[in-house]
Regions:
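Hydrophobic faces of well-ordered beta-strands that scaffold small-molecule active sites
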Residues: 25-31, 49-53
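Alpha-helix-loop-beta-strand connector modules within alpha/beta enzyme cores
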Residues: 1-27
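Glycine-rich phosphate-binding active-site loops on the catalytic face of alpha/beta enzymes
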Residues: 46-64
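Glycine-rich beta-alpha junction loops
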Residues: 31-35, 55-58
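Catalytic cores of alpha/beta
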Residues: 32-47
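Extended, intrinsically disordered, low-complexity segments
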Residues: 70-124
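Active-site-adjacent beta->alpha loops and helix N-cap segments on the catalytic face
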Residues: 1-11, 36-40, 59-69
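Alpha-helical scaffolding segments of alpha/beta enzyme cores, especially the outer helices
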Residues: 5-12, 42, 109, 113-116
C-alpha cells in the first residue's frame, strides 16, 4: 500500500540535515500499479518524478484481449461455423491482428488514464 507521507518525511529530514531547499530529492515510485489517484497525486506533491506502471499496463492489454474473446467466443471455436451459419468462416475473428488490436486499444486507454493521473498530458 502506498504511503506517501514517508516521502514527505524523507524530504523534510534531508532538507533539515543538509540545509537544502524544499524537495531536495527526486523520487521514483517503484510498484505504482494499482495505486489510488489521490495517493498518486500526494506522492507527486512530495517529489515523485517517475512512476512504474508495468503491471497495470500488462493487465490492461490482457483485459482488452480477454474482452474480445468473451465478445466473440462463439466465433473462436472453429475455423468454420458460427452463430451466423455452419458454413460461415471465422478467420477474421481469430486473426491475431484482430484480437491483438483489442489489447492495444485497451492499453492506450490505460496509458491515457495514467498520463492524466500523473499530470503528464500534453506536456512536451
Amino acid at each position: 500500500v502506498l504511503n506517501p507521507i514517508i516521502l514527505k518525511n524523507s524530504q523534510d529530514m534531508i532538507q533539515q540535515k543538509f540545509g537544502t531547499g524544499p524537495k531536495p530529492v527526486n523520487f521514483v515510485f517503484h510498484g505504482g500499479s494499482g495505486s489510488e489517484k489521490a495517493k498518486i497525486e500526494e506522492a507527486i506533491s512530495y517529489g515523485v518524478i517517475k512512476m512504474n506502471l508495468d503491471t497495470d499496463l500488462q493487465w490492461a492489454f490482457w483485459d482488452g484481449v480477454h474482452s474480445y474473446y468473451k465478445e466473440k467466443k462463439d466465433y473462436l471455436q472453429a475455423q468454420i461455423g458460427n452463430p451466423e451459419g455452419d458454413d460461415k468462416p471465422n478467420k477474421k475473428y481469430y486473426d491475431p491482428r484482430t484480437w491483438l488490436r483489442s489489447g492495444e486499444e485497451s492499453i492506450v486507454k490505460r496509458l491515457k488514464q495514467s498520463f492524466e493521473d500523473l499530470n503528464a498530458m500534453n506536456r512536451g
